[in-house]
UniProtKB/Swiss-Prot annotation:
Residues bound to ATP: G7, P8, A9, A10, S11, G12, K13, G14, T15
UniProt gene name: cmk
Main location: cytoplasm
Pfam families: Cytidylate_kin
Gene Ontology terms, MF aspect: ATP binding; CMP kinase activity; dCMP kinase activity
Keyword Flavoprotein listed: no
UniProt protein name: Cytidylate kinase
Keyword terms: ATP-binding, Cytoplasm, Kinase, Nucleotide-binding, Transferase
Single GO BP term: pyrimidine nucleotide metabolic process
Family affiliation: Belongs to the cytidylate kinase family. Type 1 subfamily.
EC number(s) reported in the record: 2.7.4.25
GO cellular component, one term: cytoplasm
């Protein structure tokens, strides 16, 4: 079984995906980390983030050991990832890696922005996770505080709104809900409530009550 979880930045999709993977014993891939790793490599090299050919070359030679770098979680890297992920050549370079991961038994949970529409369009379960920009900005603010990083919630909110626009309007794999995805708004759900709602969706599919 493949579970595809998509949604905008800081919507809580990563937490849901990790918990679902643990619950069902499936492999988990945060596809956003892949793009963050490309962005971090570009930043480290002092490269122009708008240089699509350079970014695509980084993507093709990406070292998976980079995926565990704590620096990938920084706000600056996240913003840079939004830029490089808009390049069609970068996305094309990383598609096969994601598809191969998803196809491996016993099952996989992937979260990102185009899992249900591009990477795994035939996924048995598709969930589109959303939350209001204000709630998402506050979450990111608290995350930054927990890491001891200086943060301005108003700036984070502005960045999130701009990122949403970039993600929705990019030419390559824009952020959008797949027609057969279930919408899950977790603006006012705690983590456990969101996980329970997601498990209910998956169980409905497993029981044959619903083709998501």
């Amino acid at each position: 079984m493949i579970i595809a979880i998509d949604g905008p930045a800081a919507s809580g999709k990563g937490t849901l995906a990790k918990r679902l993977a643990a619950h069902y014993g499936f492999r988990y891939l945060d596809t956003g980390v892949i793009y963050r790793a490309v962005a971090k490599a570009m930043l480290d090299a002092g490269a122009d983030l708008t240089d699509e050919a350079r970014a695509a070359e980084v993507a093709r030679t990406l070292d998976p050991s980079r995926f565990d770098d704590p620096a990938l979680k920084s706000h600056a890297v996240g913003e840079a990832a939004s830029v490089v992920s808009a390049h069609p050549q970068v996305r094309a370079a990383l598609v096969e890696f994601q598809k191969t991961f998803a196809a491996a038994p016993p099952g996989a949970v992937l979260d990102g922005r185009d899992i249900g529409t591009v990477i795994c369009p035939d996924a048995e379960v598709k969930i589109f996770v959303v939350a209001s920009p204000e709630v998402r900005a506050h979450r990111r603010f608290l995350e930054a505080q927990s890491r001891g990083e200086p943060a301005d919630e108003a700036v984070i909110l502005s960045d999130i709104v701009k990122r949403d626009e970039r993600d929705k309007n990019r030419s390559a794999a824009p952020l959008k809900q797949a027609p057969d995805a279930v919408l899950l708004d977790n603006s006012y759900l705690d983590i456990e409530g969101g996980v329970r709602a997601a498990i209910d969706i998956v169980e409905a599919v497993r029981a044959g009550r619903r083709r998501v």
